[in-house]
C-alpha cells in the first residue's frame, strides 16, 4: 500500500494509510499515516481454543486494532476505504454504514474465516491480485473481483550492472538464482535436486526461513555443497544487481502463490525465468518469450527447461531483452490506473 499510496497521492488524491503500531516507512508527500495499537495474534493463539486457529487469531488481531481505528474510519470523511484482507470487512462495513465511505475489498490470498461470506457481498467493489486468486474469491463469495496485479518499483527493478560481490564460477559455469522465503511450499528442494542433472551449474539461494537447515543438509547429502550457495536474506535494494549476475531465475513454489512478485522483479531487471506452472505464476510470465513454465515438484522437468535455455544463448538473450518491456505492465503507475477504475466502479455501485 505504501507504493500505491504514493502513486495515488502524486495524482492528487488525499491518501491516508491506517495500520498497527510498529515499524513504518517514511511516507511519500501527500500520504498521511495513522497507527493504532493492537493485540498480537500469538497472544490469542496462546489460548487453548485458538492454539491452531490461525484465521480466527488473525481476525481477532485485526479487530483489536479496528476498535481503536473505528472512530477515525467513521468520522474521517473518506470517500473510499480500501481494505487489504477480508479480516477487515466488519470494521470497514461499519464505517460504510455510519460514515458513508465506499468499501473496496482487496484479496491477495485465501485469508478466509467463518462468517466472512455474510459480509463480503456488501462491499462496493473488489480486486484480486491475479485471475487465479479471483477464481478462488469468486468461488467463496459469489462475485467476480476485478483483477489488479500487484506492482513493482520499476525505478529500482531495472537492468543494472552485476553485483561485484557475486563471484562467477571460475570455469564460466552457468549461475542460477532462487529468491524468496525458505518455506516448505516454496519447493527450493526441487531446484537443488534439479542441479544434479545440470552439470557444472551453480545455484544461488537468496532468502532465509524455516527450511534453510534442511536444504543445506540436502545439498550436502547430494554432493552439491560446492555448487549450491546460500546467501541469506538481502535488502531489496541489492536484488537488481543480484539478478544481473545470474543467467536464469528459478521459481519452484507448489502452493500458496497467488501472484509471483519476485518473478516480475527479475524480468524487470532483464532476467529470464523458469517457474512452476502453478497459482499466479503463469500470469506474470510471457511463456516462451520471457521465460518457461514447468510442472510443479518435478526436478527432471525443471532441469530439462533450464538446459534448453542454457544450450541456446541466443534464445536466452532474446528473453532477457523482452523481459523488461513485459514487466512494465506491473509498474505502480499501471496498477494505479486499474485501482482508480475500481474506485470509480465502487462510487458508481458496480461491484
Positions of PLM-derived features:
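Carbohydrate-associated surface elements
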Residues: 132, 151
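A conserved mid-protein helix/loop that constitutes part of the nucleotide-sugar donor-binding site
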Residues: 174, 178-197, 210-216, 292, ...
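Conserved acidic donor-binding segment of nucleotide-sugar-dependent glycosyltransferases
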Residues: 287-288, 292-299, 308-313
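Short alpha-helical donor nucleotide-sugar binding micro-motif in glycosyltransferases
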Residues: 233-234, 241-246
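Short hydrophobic beta-strand element within catalytic cores of glycosyltransferases
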Residues: 272-275, 285
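Nucleotide-activated donor-binding/catalytic signature segment of Leloir-type glycosyltransferases, i.e.
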Residues: 98, 216-234
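Short His-centered aromatic/hydrophobic patch
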Residues: 61-62, 83-88, 107
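Acidic donor-binding loop of glycosyltransferase active sites
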Residues: 227, 244-258, 271
Amino acid at each position: 500500500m505504501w507504493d500505491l499510496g504514493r502513486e495515488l497521492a502524486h495524482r492528487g488524491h488525499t491518501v491516508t494509510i491506517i495500520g498497527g503500531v510498529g515499524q513504518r516507512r517514511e511516507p511519500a508527500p501527500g500520504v498521511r499515516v495513522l497507527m493504532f495499537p493492537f493485540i498480537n495474534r500469538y497472544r490469542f493463539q496462546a489460548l487453548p481454543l485458538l492454539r491452531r486457529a490461525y484465521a480466527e487469531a488473525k481476525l481477532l488481531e485485526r479487530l483489536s486494532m479496528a476498535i481503536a481505528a473505528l472512530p477515525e474510519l467513521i468520522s474521517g470523511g473518506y470517500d473510499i476505504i480500501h481494505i487489504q484482507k477480508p479480516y477487515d470487512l466488519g470494521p470497514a462495513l461499519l464505517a460504510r454504514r455510519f460514515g458513508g465511505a465506499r468499501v473496496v475489498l482487496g484479496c491477495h490470498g485465501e485469508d478466509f474465516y467463518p462468517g466472512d461470506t455474510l459480509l463480503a457481498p456488501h462491499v462496493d467493489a473488489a480486486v484480486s491480485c491475479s485471475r487465479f486468486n479471483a477464481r478462488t474469491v469468486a468461488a467463496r463469495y459469489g462475485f467476480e473481483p476485478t483483477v489488479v496485479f500487484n506492482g513493482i518499483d520499476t525505478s529500482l527493478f531495472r537492468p543494472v550492472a552485476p553485483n561485484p560481490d557475486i563471484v562467477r564460477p571460475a570455469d564460466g559455469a552457468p549461475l542460477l538464482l532462487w529468491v524468496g522465503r525458505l518455506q516448505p511450499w516454496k519447493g527450493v528442494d526441487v531446484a537443488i535436486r534439479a542441479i544434479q542433472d545440470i552439470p557444472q551449474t551453480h545455484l544461488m539461494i537468496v532468502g532465509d526461513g524455516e527450511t534453510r537447515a534442511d536444504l543445506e543438509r540436502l545439498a550436502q547429502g547430494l554432493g552439491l555443497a560446492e555448487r549450491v550457495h546460500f546467501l541469506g536474506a538481502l535488502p531489496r535494494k541489492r536484488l537488481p544487481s543480484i539478478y544481473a549476475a545470474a543467467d536464469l531465475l528459478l521459481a519452484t513454489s507448489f502452493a500458496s502463490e497467488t501472484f509471483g512478485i519476485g518473478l516480475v522483479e527479475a524480468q524487470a531487471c532483464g532476467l529470464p525465468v523458469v517457474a512452476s506452472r502453478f497459482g499466479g505464476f503463469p500470469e506474470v510470465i510471457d511463456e516462451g518469450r520471457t521465460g518457461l513454465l514447468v510442472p510443479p515438484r518435478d526436478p527432471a522437468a525443471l532441469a530439462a527447461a533450464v538446459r534448453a535455455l542454457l544450450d541456446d544463448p541466443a534464445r536466452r538473450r532474446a528473453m532477457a531483452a523482452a523481459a523488461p518491456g513485459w514487466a512494465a505492465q506491473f509498474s505502480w503507475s499501471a496498477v494505479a490506473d486499474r485501482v482508480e477504475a475500481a474506485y470509480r466502479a465502487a462510487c458508481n455501485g458496480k461491484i
